[in-house]
Every structure is written in C-alpha cells, then in structure tokens.
Amino acid sequence: HQRANLQNKGKKPDVLYMSATPIPRTYALTIFGDMDVSTIKERPKGRQKITTVVKKNSEIKDVLEMMYKELKQNHQVYVIAPLIEESENSDLTTVCKLKDQMKLAFGEHYKIDIVHGKMASAAKDMIMNQFSENKIQILISTTVIEVGVDVPNATTMVIFDADRFGLSTLHQLRGRVGRGSSKSQCILISDSDAERLKIMEQVDDGFKISEEDFKLRGHGDLFGTKQSGDMSFKIANIRSD
C-alpha cells in the first residue's frame, strides 16, 4: 500500500526494489509484476562463504567447543533463542535460560549479555555498542538482531530451536556473521528433520532461498497483507503455470 502511494505521486516513475532476502510475496511480485530482476552474486571483497551446519540438542557439547574455538581467536558469537522467558505453554529455548547456560560454560573468561525486543531502546543501543566494541563476546538475543547489525568480528551464529524460524529469518540471522575477512559459521540446533534446515545447509543464495520458501509457504496476497499461503485459485498453479 505504501509503495503504491509513492508510485502514484509521479507519472509512471521508475521504481527500484532492493532485497537481500525476498519474502515469498516479493518473489511472486518479481514473477507476476512485470519486473526486471538483477542479482548481485559476488560477495564483497575479502568475505568468505559462511559454513552452515545442523546439530541436534544431544550435540550441544560439540557446539560449545565450536564456539570456544572462535572465542579463543578473539572473535565474537551470537546466540539466538525464539523466546525471551519461559512459558507454561511452551518448552522452547529462552534467552534467559541460555544466559545461565552460557555463563556456566564461558562466564569465567568472556563477557556475556542479552538483548531483546522488550528492552528499552537506550538499553539495547548500549549493549549493541558494547558488542560492536568487543566489550561483550557472547550476545544472546531473539530475532531483534536479524537486520541492521554489522559487527565484522562476529564469526559464529548459533540458533536454538532453528526449526521454529522461517527460511527468510534464518537467512537474515546467518547474514549477521561473515561480514569480515574471517571464516564464519552458522550452527542450527534442532532435533527436527525440517526441510528448511536442509535447505539452509545447502543454499546461501538469497533468491534461491526465497524460491524454496515460496514452494514451502506459498506467496500470500499480491494486493493484500497476507505474506504466505495460497491464493486458492481453482485451476491455475501459480508456481508451475
């Protein structure tokens, strides 16, 4: 709606849409919106491909060792949880629980802190600045850090209950590392065999991931607010036709 209003301000304006990880609806618009598509496939100079692996909860010791290896090299680590606090209706990993676990494993030698959406903006900004300056080595967070965070020294992204996140979110979170010249890794922790986790291990191209997300979730409304699901056409198949 906002984009349509902007376009209506001029007479047939040229419009440039930019996206690192298109959601299914955006991908559908490129197919059916008569758009020319240009992709930048090269990584910025000096950056390496991010290695993505899936680990089960029983392999947490291996994950901690992978984190420690990077911390010893003076690198930093993101740890992501789907929830802030424990809930009676859910057994998902929480930021608060991970803070205790990480302090037990690394608290003697490394500074650990948390950030999430319920915190005041000033408090979040202070913690993010400290992380940027390497005054915090392990940052535990919700998906609040999935966009707009650039810390080249952070080389490891650990995502707990990774099967609870969509492909676009996982790809955005993975993009918080690999922003410097050092080799980086993304570790997805889940006991699920979800198809999207296998896709994350094999694919690092944002448009390809969007295409797979399109297949898994549907495209939503082209002229509405729904960002996933089907259009419920009686005959046509949007993907194959």
Q: What spans do the regions from the language model cover?
A:
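Post-DEXD/H (motif II) to motif III coupling segment of the RecA-like Helicase ATP-binding lobe
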Residues: 1-78
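Short amphipathic alpha-helical segments
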Residues: 2-5, 28-31, 91-92, 150-154, ...
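Structural recognition of the conserved hydrophobic beta-strand(s) that form the central parallel beta-sheet
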Residues: 14-20, 29-30, 80, 138-141, ...
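Short glycine-rich anion-binding loops that position phosphate/pyrophosphate groups of nucleotides
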Residues: 21, 83-85, 144-146
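C-terminal helicase module of SF1/SF2 nucleic-acid helicases/translocases
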Residues: 60-75, 96-241
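Glycine- and acidic-residue-enriched helix-capping/strand-helix junction motifs
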Residues: 86-98
